[in-house]
Design a protein with these regions (language model features):
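Non-catalytic cap/lid and distal C-terminal segments of serine-dependent acyl enzymes
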Residues: 1-187
Length: 187
């Protein structure tokens, strides 16, 4: 197993308070395009691996890994998302009918994803989404439970794992969770 870690552009996208919501989503979409059109081909060339990959991350990385998996399940056959917030409103507030923000708000758009191609890919993937209930995890809980409910209603097998009240939104826990879930995937 080999990991490639990519820097984010969150300070220019979702966390850029001086931009409006649409422009934040646009910056994120440009980043997604970079990942799919430049980083992934580079990784495939570098490794000689041309099969599906795994997306994974913690906190904002949890959001990114899950969102890019939902957008590109042909590229990513596995996802481990830890402690993410999966609702774009957390970053931009109410967004009305902005299609670009909606597309990048997993806890919203999954409910209307009925395309058989996507659903079949999701059903054949290894999907793990984990959260704790301890300090700093509360912001992500509503979107975590919304995703869980949507996946259940769409009969998409996924492991939505909730850890205890002592499990904080912090690196010491992610260092425990990541090896645990990798082991569960036999990786």
């Amino acid at each position: 197993m080999q990991f490639f870690t990519l820097s984010s552009v969150d300070s220019e996208s979702w966390l850029c308070d001086w931009k409006n919501g649409h422009d934040r989503a646009l910056a994120h979409t440009q980043y997604e395009k970079y990942v799919i059109e430049e980083a992934i081909p580079f990784i495939k060339h570098k490794t000689g691996w041309f099969g599906q990959m795994m997306a994974t991350g913690c906190s904002m990385g949890g959001y990114h890994s899950f969102n890019i998996f939902l957008q590109h399940p042909d590229v990513f056959g596995k996802v481990i998302a830890l402690s993410g917030v999966y609702d774009a409103r957390f970053f931009v507030g109410e967004y009305g009918n902005d299609e670009l923000i909606y597309r990048n708000s997993p806890s919203d758009n999954i409910w209307n994803q009925n395309d058989g191609w996507f659903i079949d890919h999701y059903r054949n993937a290894d999907i793990i989404v984990c959260t704790g209930l301890g300090p700093w995890e509360q912001d992500g809980l509503p979107s975590f439970y919304s995703l869980k409910k949507a996946f259940e209603e769409k009969n998409i097998p996924a492991w939505f794992d909730v850890w205890g009240d002592d499990v904080a939104h912090d690196w010491p826990w992610w260092r425990i969770q990541m090896p645990y879930f990798l082991d569960k995937l036999n990786l």
